[in-house]
């Protein structure tokens, strides 16, 4: 199973969050860079373990992204989510 570690500090910036996720999770070029597209891509992932490191500051953007990851984790049996 592929393992990916995401830096929560980079999930807190609205301007860069989707570019970071697209690169780290190897999303397709047509990724829509919004929360709905994030959910769609996360639910289509093949077996992967994603660890999200909590950010220094827990802002609104991070909370929205985290909710999407948790929802996708409940839907996609091939996605294992860890939060540290």
Which functions belong to the PLM regions below?
Residues 1-84:
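Positively charged, polar, low-complexity stretches
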